[in-house]
Amino acid sequence: ALPAPLIDRHDVGAAMLQGTSYQEPQETLENLRQAMQTPQYEQSSEIPFGVVRAMLDLGLTYQARTWLESLKDRLSHNWRFHWYSGVTNTLIGDFQSAQANFTSVLVAVPGEAAPKLAIAAIDELILQSNGYLTGALLDDALSRAAAGIRTHLGELPSETFEAWQSKGVLAEDWTMLSDTPTVLRFNALRLYSLVWLTNPTTVSSAFGLARLLMAEREVELAVAALDKVPNSSRHHRMAQLTTILDLVSDELTESRIRRAARRLEEIPNNEPRFLQIKVYVLRAALTLLRDAGVDRAASDHSLFEYEFTTRDLRRGLATTLREQARIAPYARHRYALVDMANKVRPATWF
């Protein structure tokens, strides 16, 4: 979710808006509309923006856009106008307009993280709507430098940028306004990276950065980005679970599968998603052996409590599926898990 800008405390309506913070959205909307009719607040810009917030809270998205259009002549010079227009256009699905709105905000307040995150998210949505959400779009060197984790854009020679510009990968003016897939991916990567590396409290930027790095098949960098989520963050557990999935989601190797298993073993087994992810890792191990046409891994070390062999991994997968079935909330789900366990368990006489 995108944040709402802080209220301008110098605005004549600031005190009134602070008084509505604990009201229901419908009550807030009615009070603000009444206030706008009084001479005391007719010069306020925050009260009209408060109306937009209340409308969005009520799900009145199209009404909010109509209201913003009515404010254009009076308040379009205010960056908050473009922010709320961007949020509204995002909810409506007009991503190109939202991109332009958030770019205007970034020009007005270039040091803020919020417009950078907003543009990166919009670029992802445009890529998704055009079918480019997954799949590498950038040169390896460019995606790694844009991520800013181990290398940086400043370390690349100018000739590299000139070559990318000639290919249309980069815009000559580095504009944020684009519908070109490579430019969208590059901008989103570097904006997520810029926010994450300068403000570690914005954990959403870490997940965004890792998501795009996975699309670029930069698994190790995606894991490195999420490993930087601090232990004190309430999102730390989710970040660690995501790294496990990342390690077994792309090109499978024995090393990555073992690393994923070790990471999962460090997480308490009362974690609600523990068994689900254990199933995912065991399945990845079986897939690795099957695709390689072998019955056992190169190393004799076990994976979890099972030998890294086809037979023992199938036994482990069946056991884990049955454990998951015991805690399944619905009978239909439980039966499906037991059926899956029966299909994968190794054949026995009993």
Spans of model-derived segments:
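Non-membrane alpha-helical segments in proteins
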Residues: 46-57, 80-91
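Structural motif corresponding to the intra-repeat A-B loop/turn of tetratricopeptide repeats
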Residues: 58, 92, 126-128, 182, ...
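Alpha-helical repeat scaffolds
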Residues: 28-35, 63-71, 96-105, 131-157, ...
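Residue-level recognition of tetratricopeptide repeat
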Residues: 53, 87, 121-123, 128, ...
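Alpha-solenoid helical repeat scaffolds
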Residues: 49-50, 80-84, 100, 114-119, ...
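Regulatory extensions appended to serine/threonine kinase catalytic cores
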Residues: 1-48
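C-terminal non-catalytic interaction modules
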Residues: 280-350
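Short coil turns that delineate tetratricopeptide repeat
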Residues: 42, 76, 110, 200, ...
